[in-house]
């Protein structure tokens, strides 16, 4: 039998291991350099790498493992790499949403994850562009056949992500949040 303390230690260990793997993927694959777009690349990386617990990524990886087990399949090295790719993309999308959420026109948050928000560290326009770049990088990465070999799987993932992020998903939820904050007299049906 496991005690609650043992389970928490195991969970924290898995979460930390997963976070390191996602950070490694992001560090290796997000753009970097000293050229024309160096500030943009730095801002993208600032809000993505070594930032946050990466719980969404953890859930992607662990769900993939679980689904393999219940379908009596082993997680191959290539399937695990696909899970890490998808998990990293979801973290990049989450970082993009947080960068935009912190902007003065939205929540105007000066800090995020224990450090200055992207727009505070850089400036508003760099933060907007860093978020936009993370968003497009996510779809570029999923569409790249070097990461996920099966073209139908890539198309399915892109569709599912776009639907979850779009006007009836995360972005629509942000709009509703903004409307609720400026119009506190919304009906229950509108909420």
Predicted regions and their residues:
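Intrinsic disorder/low-complexity segments enriched in polar/small residues
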Residues: 1-2, 74
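Mg2+-dependent prenyl diphosphate-binding active-site environment of isoprenoid biosynthetic enzymes
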Residues: 30-191
